[in-house]
Amino acid sequence: LQSFADLITIEEYKKTARPKVVMTWAPHPRPLPQAVPNSFAEWMNATDYEFVITHPEGYELAPQFVGNAKVEYDQMKAFEGADFIYAKNWAAYSGDNYGQILSKDRDWTVSDRQMAVTNNAYFMHCLPVRRNMIVTDDVIESPQSIVIPEAANREISATVVLKRLLELSLIHI
């Protein structure tokens, strides 16, 4: 439901038919599961958006979730011209490093420095967020932060899915 809410939010705020959406890895003190990045990537790949995934080497997502996304290991390059920035931490996926933290590089924290190279991008995160680790206060408190409307869209996404499930169950009665 979270990634569906994210899609609804992008649809509400996009200024072009094909926005550039960047999902960026960000540091976190604990290794987090890949569920949110994987489902976000699935929804983005189902759209006609320009979708870029950026992370340090070693944090690759499974190919079935990466899909047609461009993978860029240089975060600043990935952010160039972006319309939406979606920040999320995830643990390493492959090999002997599965589930581990390979980097706590604070240069990957989303800050004004990275946002300056975007197309005045909106900042997104599924919340709760580790301030000044995933994203700086300046970014999450900026007018370009849409984390609150994004969170509110969880109710809409849940309502849509529940309605559809109920409609399907009524068909079988």
Positions of the model-derived regions?
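Conserved small/polar residues in nucleotide/adenosyl-binding loops
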Residues: 171-173
